[in-house]
Amino acid sequence: DVAPSRGLGDVYKRQVYNELSQAAMQYMTDNNAVNLKEAGLTNAVSIDAFIKKYFKIVKECGTDGTDCYGKGYKKIDGSTYNPAMQGDTTRSYILANGASISFIPNNIAQIHLDVNGAKGPNIIGRDVFALRLYNNGLIDDYCAQAPCSKEERETRFNTYCTVNSDGTWWGCFGKILNDNWEMTY
């Protein structure tokens, strides 16, 4: 078992990313659709059905994700943050691979991911990331349309990932995509 840490955690991040990507593409294929909205992925109920069909779930946390995540999350600069989303439209799960994941319907889905669940280090940008699932089935950082440009990813990283930014934590995942799955920060 590979412990997620600087460099080695890349295996876990990539595994979950690949599983999400494959599930999105398979969902469109299974529904004979050109994009996720056409396939029916439009709200919390359809996201819940998508997760249950394409992923092995060991725990459902429903609209209160706190039971799916650890305690004491921090950003790289040491500021505190809680990635467990709560709300009527949020759905949180622990997957069989140990990852904690929350889906928030928002122009398809915003995704909060802790690649190793409640286990440490619980640091945004190390084992915890914010991603987006776009209508075209791509998974990327936050931008107008996926795939995000390298410049957009770098801007998000420098603006939000490593600094206290009032609860915004985009950019960490995009930086890893830009840097070929390596944490260079």
Regions flagged by a language model, labelled:
Residues D1-V2, N82:
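Generic structural signal for short, flexible, solvent-exposed coil/loop and linker residues
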Residues V2-L8, Y12, L20:
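Single conserved hydrophobic/aromatic residue that forms the stacking wall/gate
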